[in-house]
């Protein structure tokens, strides 16, 4: 082939370099809205029903923490043993929820609560012992060296 003809063909299909427009790459972002729609459609097929008047939901984890949902929306399908919770979950320690959560605790959670109470009492004893030692050390006044009188040095 002729070199001039080849150069003209290359110039017409030039992709990059000086003087060529930039090509924008189209990026497709997958939104979470599509996932929510799929989930809603699946739940609708399972014939879930809303459950009213649920004030809070607590899920107990193995490490002793609790996932707490305040005023969630709850849907359930009893025949398929499926429950859906909608809301913002917060991870909290068991001690933060203790007064109102005692009637919800099962045997496993009660055991972890006992362990937590024992460790808390031990921490209190250790702190009290350490505070007592610090007070004794601060109250100690160093003894004066025999034969020295500091009052005479002041004058």
From Swiss-Prot:
Subcellular location(s) per record: Cytoplasm; Nucleus
| Broad class of the protein's primary localization | cytoplasm
Q: Where is the composition biased (Basic residues)?
A: 20-30
Keyword hit for Transcription: yes
Q: Which residues form the NAC-A/B domain?
A: 33-98
Q: Which Pfam families match?
A: NAC
UniProt biased composition (Acidic residues): 136-155
Keyword Chaperone, does the record have it? Answer: no
Q: Which UniProt keywords apply?
A: Cytoplasm, Nucleus, Protein transport, Repressor, Transcription, Transcription regulation, Transport
| One biological process term in Gene Ontology | protein transport
Which Gene Ontology cellular-component terms appear in the entry?
nascent polypeptide-associated complex; nucleus
InterPro entries named in the record: BTF3, NAC_A/B_dom_sf, Nas_poly-pep-assoc_cplx_dom
Positions of the UniProt region annotated as Disordered: 1-35, 116-155
Subunit structure and binding partners = Part of the nascent polypeptide-associated complex (NAC), consisting of egd2 and egd1. NAC associates with ribosomes via egd1.
To which protein family does this belong?
Belongs to the NAC-beta family.
What is the annotated role of this protein in its UniProt record? Component of the nascent polypeptide-associated complex (NAC), a dynamic component of the ribosomal exit tunnel, protecting the emerging polypeptides from interaction with other cytoplasmic proteins to ensure appropriate nascent protein targeting. The NAC complex also promotes mitochondrial protein import by enhancing productive ribosome interactions with the outer mitochondrial membrane and blocks the inappropriate interaction of ribosomes translating non-secretory nascent polypeptides with translocation sites in the membrane of the endoplasmic reticulum.
> What name does UniProt use for this protein?
Nascent polypeptide-associated complex subunit beta
């Amino acid at each position: 082939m002729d070199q001039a003809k080849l150069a003209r063909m290359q110039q017409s299909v030039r992709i990059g370099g000086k003087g060529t427009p930039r090509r924008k790459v189209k990026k497709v972002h997958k939104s979470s809205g599509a996932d929510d729609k799929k989930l809603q459609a699946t739940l609708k097929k399972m014939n879930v029903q809303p459950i009213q008047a649920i004030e809070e939901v607590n899920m107990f984890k193995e490490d002793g923490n609790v996932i707490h949902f305040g005023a969630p929306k709850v849907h359930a399908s009893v025949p398929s043993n499926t429950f859906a919770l909608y809301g913002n979950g917060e991870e909290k320690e068991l001690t933060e929820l203790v007064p109102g959560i005692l009637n919800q605790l099962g045997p496993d959670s009660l055991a972890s609560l006992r362990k937590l109470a024992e460790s808390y009492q031990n921490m209190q004893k250790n702190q009290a012992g350490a505070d007592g030692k610090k007070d004794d050390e601060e109250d100690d006044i160093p003894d004066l060296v025999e034969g020295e009188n500091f009052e005479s040095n002041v004058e």
